[in-house]
Amino acid sequence: MADQKILWGIAPIGWRNDDIPEIGAGNTLSHLLSDIVVARFQGTEVGGFFPDAKTLNKELELRNLKIAGQWFSSYLIRDPFESVSKEFHAHCAYLEEVGASVAVVSEQTYSIQQSEQNIFTEKPMFTDSEWLTLCEGLNELGKIAQQYGLTLVYHHHMGTGVQTLAEVDRLMENTDPTLVSLLYDTGHIYVSDNDYMLLLTKHLDRIKHVHFKDVRSDILAKCQEQGQSFLQSFLAGMFTVPGDGCIDFTKVYDVLLTHDYRGWIVVEAEQDPAKAHPLEYALKARQYIDEKLLTTDEMKERI
């Protein structure tokens, strides 16, 4: 597994959701990890309900699974750097212990992703001084991540101050490329900008982690028309797994391969598990990846 250029994972968000803890609350860690094995993925990202590192490592070892990384909500604009740094050190120490490769960071100051606000029209905007604070802080967090053998990857996200291509551009232009890399999420940039290729091609050199998230365009249109919140939109089924929506992942994957991308591609599709059976959708994603994306040689490597 370690010799493969690309590792395929699937995020726990299809089973349980940290933003709405009651969603899928009956899905245990053992259930999640065993489903991932059945669907033939190589690993996952850490969810909020995951246990201590020793317990998690035992469960992973039993199933030959790996951890890619974990989300970290930064408040560099709102909070003193010392408090953010302390939390991030603990976050990275845990990730190092479970063998992760990336620390996924998203600035949550002013975020509306957990509020009832219209996710499509009411996103926050940072001032020039706030941008400076954010970028300087991210550079410092990047140094911390490296102390633990991790790469900091920034997650552009709906409902935050770094959502659009223009905002990602500004973040990339004002952070050190040796310290701050990019997580490319197909679904978030498509919902934000109605395009998913430009961000990919423009920032290929900074992309060190990838989320494959598909979008149901009909449900997206309804959610936009109704002015839904982020939580309402994903519960309505705006997001789904690759092959079940409107994004052409063959184009995305071809660009990544051409650029010799190395790292994780994680299927991440937050849905209501009561409506979208997690294992069923994991298997759908696996089938799409096998039939539409992987070459014969890549398939042989996986056997």
From Swiss-Prot:
Transmembrane segments: none
Cofactor: glutathione; Co(2+); Mn(2+)
EC number: 4.2.1.44
GO BP: any one term: inositol catabolic process
Record InterPro entries: IolE, IolE/MocC, IolE/XylAMocC-like, Xyl_isomerase-like_sf, Xyl_isomerase-like_TIM-brl
Biological pathway: Polyol metabolism; myo-inositol degradation into acetyl-CoA; acetyl-CoA from myo-inositol: step 2/7
Catalytic reaction equation(s): scyllo-inosose = 3D-3,5/4-trihydroxycyclohexane-1,2-dione + H2O
Protein name: Inosose dehydratase
Species this protein is from: Halalkalibacterium halodurans (strain ATCC BAA-125 / DSM 18197 / FERM 7344 / JCM 9153 / C-125)
